[in-house]
């Protein structure tokens, strides 16, 4: 089923061989307020201590926090934060009130609210939207319907509710992407990363870290528009009016949590059946959380589905469920240069 292809690793200090350059938008924005919504999982109910840590962390950075009206609620059977209209309305109410809208966490059901979002109001007020995991659906839909650049992949609970040092490392990329005055930014390779699962509620020890490396699968350089996010979520909206068009100008970004080979292979097959891999001009694959010793699976799958394409392909990037997570612009213009 799978073949093999040579790969090349790039470590910290090797940025000259791997360049991801982002043409920034929002460079004149003065971010003062962050609104928090829960369009999918009721994480603010289940992870109250971690949510509070995330809110206090952002407040200590000087931001005014505006909580959506589903904050702290159990929702439907503790699995969905509220009725579909309630979840959509929570986001709609935040649109004119804040500079940034950030989701509390991911989940499984953000695609259900897409037809109830006030896209006209969002385009008019144009707050910065930051999604994570399942809320990839909103990040993609808001970009498709309004043309406004959105961002992945950070959330209040998952990223800023972390204990040190990863809350600060995640914030570095928030600040770097949204508050730098530079017009172009080169994304930096984090020194270390982690996907270790330990107690979210009470600090016991610092998470174990791994020395970081990004991996060149195919060399090349391409300037294009970044589209993508959580692959499981993309499969849930592909072919609908909410999925941005994939063209020869697209640099595709994919990430997920690794559960099993069958599910991952199915999702890549779905994208292939839609002709995605035959169109794109570049590909960035982020680290798959909890993949562990199965990391070679990613290399094999990429080789099968995209190995025939002579396009730049980067593996082991940091934008998704692992820490730290770079913040990347959906709809933004970037340059992917691998040599």
Model-found features: residue ranges?
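ATP/NTP phosphate-donor binding region
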Residues: 18-97
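Charged helix-capping and loop-helix junction motifs
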Residues: 50-51, 83-86, 266-271, 296-303
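Short Gly/Thr/Asp-enriched flexible loops that form oxyanion-binding sites at enzyme active sites
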Residues: 106-124, 140-143, 297-298
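Short, acidic/small-residue loops that bind anionic groups at enzyme active sites
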Residues: 119-145, 149-156, 309-313
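Conserved anion/nucleotide-ligand pocket segment
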Residues: 151-229
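Internal helical hairpin/lid segments
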Residues: 235-293, 297
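ATP/nucleoside-binding phosphotransfer catalytic cores, i.e., glycine-rich phosphate-binding loops
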Residues: 282-339
